[in-house]
From Swiss-Prot:
This is Probable proteasome subunit beta type-2. It comes from Drosophila melanogaster (Fruit fly). GO terms for cellular component: cytosol; nucleus; proteasome core complex, beta-subunit complex. Non-catalytic component of the proteasome, a multicatalytic proteinase complex which is characterized by its ability to cleave peptides with Arg, Phe, Tyr, Leu, and Glu adjacent to the leaving group at neutral or slightly basic pH. The proteasome has an ATP-dependent proteolytic activity. The 26S proteasome consists of a 20S proteasome core and two 19S regulatory subunits. The 20S proteasome core is composed of 28 subunits that are arranged in four stacked rings, resulting in a barrel-shaped structure. The two end rings are each formed by seven alpha subunits, and the two central rings are each formed by seven beta subunits. The catalytic chamber with the active sites is on the inside of the barrel. InterPro entries: Ntn_hydrolases_N, Proteasome_beta2, Proteasome_bsu_CS, Proteasome_sua/b, Proteasome_suB-type. The gene is Prosbeta4R2. Keywords: Cytoplasm, Nucleus, Proteasome. The keyword Nucleus applies. SUPFAM superfamilies: N-terminal nucleophile aminohydrolases (Ntn hydrolases) (SSF56235). PROSITE patterns: PROTEASOME_BETA_1 (PS00854), PROTEASOME_BETA_2 (PS51476). It is found in: Cytoplasm; Nucleus.
Amino acid sequence: MAMETILGIKGPDFVMLASDTMQAKSLVFMKDDQSKIHRLSDFNMMATVGDGGDTIQFTDFISKNLHLYKISHGYHLSAKSAAHFTRKTLADYIRTNTRYQVAMLLAGYDAVEGPDLHYIDSYGAAQSINHAGHGWGSMFCGSILQRYWNSKLSQEDAYSLMKKCVLEIQRRLIINQRNFEVYVVDSKGMRKMEAINPGSLNKESISLSW
């Protein structure tokens, strides 16, 4: 399991992704500003964990192919279609000598299908899901997400839920994941939100509206 963390939450009209920004090699800390959430199109984004070279190369390959599809057909693939293409590509590479060690969460918004969040593991298995995570930190967040997620979740509550998860990770995980970047995609497109870090984690302010 990767010494990284990515989390995803789907709401009624949006999807939110969060990831730590730490880059490490074995037990060596390299830097703390590595972005792991990548823009695939105006309404699709992907968070990845795994081998550093594999995540960059594979994400770039998927992004370029989705852009080529847009040029060829005049429209972007929906999150569901993009997830299917990504899953198939990853599964095909498993059957060759060029296997990518990468797992991901793919999030998107479509005017017809609405918001969509897909969990894709390193073996090419994919599942549409309401909340998910990859990496060590996600082990501490599953019960939190199951308890507090609901189908009417607002963006503000989803962000508070992300902060609750990050706080639990920083309490219990020996690995120092001190900074998390957060992105949301909805009918207005993909945009970056305020990062979650020790400076923004005021324990008293983390409250949910239900």
